[in-house]
Amino acid sequence: MSLIPASISTAIADRAKILGTLETLVLGAAGGLLFLWANLPGGLISGAMVAVGIAALAGRPLHMPPILTQTVLVLLGITLGSLVSRQLIQHMSAYPLTIGLLALATFCMTFGSSFYLQRFHRWDPTSALLAASPGALSQITILAAEKGADVPAIAVVQTMRVIILTAALPLVLALTGIAPSAPPVFASVVASPLELAALIAAAIAVALLLRLAKFPASWMFGAMIASSVLHGTALIEGGLPPWMRGVALVGIGAVIGTRFARIRKSTLLSHVNAGLGSFAVAIIISAIFVAVILLTTNVRFADVVVAFAPGAMDAMLALALTLHIDPIFVGAHHLSRFVFVSITTPGIIHLFGRPQEDVDD
């Protein structure tokens, strides 16, 4: 008798998740198509993110299961890899200098934003440093829980930074003429069914290998590497059908938007000023380093802006796809920052965070 209520509650929970997933997909598609119809730059990803984010803040039980998120990341990686060309690879000579400056910029952004949060919002040093660290959100969240930091406040600041960048960056770049507002023109050749199957199989295989090796963003980068090799060696010439590329962009936007579903409205409102202020500090510091790179290298302005933007790796690569921006350059820099943040943040917290015992000790 006791098994019946348990089975019913499980079925209800599963049904709620399915309905939440369907609602997320419908809202994301509607928002993306609306922004695309309005000819807004980065319309599919920005529209999906805004629509899902607003619904999540309104209390809708939105949900994106891991299998759908992984599928979206694989499709995005395949599309990014198909854009790789010899001309883009030739620009890699500038990477050591720009990646070195990115590491320094990350260090300055972390301490600059942390100082702002401590000075003007009275945050404790540990929470401020973790909230100010750009990228590697999963590692930051785990470390915050271990150190007894204010996890909800950190989540608000980190999420706001990603949301603002993803929504505003395409619009700013387009309005200033730095990046085109029109959707990117992809190769008109679509891979044959056999090529498409081989492309997807190779993408999943490499992604699984990277996942076993604990490589960050393994689904997206694995697919990107496989696609780059197959297209770069001319083994496959065609790419994904347009509708698949659209699904990838809408999916990424929906995934970002669902982050608000995990944040209470009261928590968001209580930390919105901290999020906006720390974001402004990070952008000012990033702009200084972007200016230095523009004066010392021949890298395009738009490429540097997106590569140095303190946003999520998957979101920034999706923007690179929609704004005609070098995916290799952006990917290399965001991956480098991910590694830098993951390696250095525990040491920074140990040296500069509040002195206390770990929660799990």
Residue ranges of each PLM-predicted region?
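Membrane-interface helix termini and inter-helical loops of multi-pass transporters
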Residues: 86-94, 175-191, 233-242, 266, ...
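Intrinsically disordered, low-complexity non-transmembrane regions of multi-pass membrane transporters
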Residues: 1-26, 137-139, 150-153, 178-193, ...
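Cytoplasmic-side transmembrane-helix entry/capping segments in multi-pass membrane proteins
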Residues: 65-77, 96-101, 122-133, 155-160, ...
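Membrane-embedded alpha-helical segments of transport systems
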Residues: 136-140, 155-174, 285, 313-315, ...
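Alpha-helical membrane segments and immediately flanking helix-loop junctions
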Residues: 117-160, 299-333
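C-terminal ends of transmembrane helices
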Residues: 53-64, 111-123, 141-146, 153, ...
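Structural signature of multi-pass alpha-helical membrane transport proteins
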Residues: 2-68, 72-88, 194-264, 284-291
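Transmembrane alpha-helix boundary signature
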Residues: 61-64, 82-95, 111-124, 291, ...
